[in-house]
Amino acid sequence: MSTPWLQTLAALALLSTGVVYGTDVFFALVARPALRRTDEASMTRVLGHLHAVGDTRMPLIGATGLLATAGLALAAGGWHTRTGSLALLALLGLLTHLLVYLRVAKPVNQAQTAAAQHDIIPPDARALQTRWDSVISLRAGALTVAMSALLAATYQLP
């Protein structure tokens, strides 16, 4: 595959994944400790509305990063080349992030969104957030692997 096409896939993968990466790292480093200082009502309302917007807009960005990374891995030759291998490592990081999001974070997001939309504070509001918090470092770590591998793959391009 031509170098401009590989560079385009790499740029698209980096830009899209970078949005998700930045969001999760922000929540791991800033939002999580700040939210621990808030009351359940404020936390539920703010996070419920954030998740309502985020869970509508972020899937397109995440899917773009995932597909561009998969395309880069395939177009660069997969395990047979250094660029392809690095792109596959990035893909593994993205898939790990997605799996953890779907299994743990998304159900919490949906519960918080429903609570905020109906203006109710669930009795387990803090437990819900603790569940979400329990995987944010893993998600951010998986995305760090993905971003690092994508950057390294990009440096390998001619």
What are these regions (language model features)?
Residues 60-72, 139-148:
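Core segments of transmembrane alpha-helices
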Residues 95-104:
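Mid-bilayer segments of alpha-helical transmembrane spans in multi-pass integral membrane proteins
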Residues 7-8, 17-64, 109, 113-130:
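Interfacial loop at the N-terminal end of multi-pass membrane proteins
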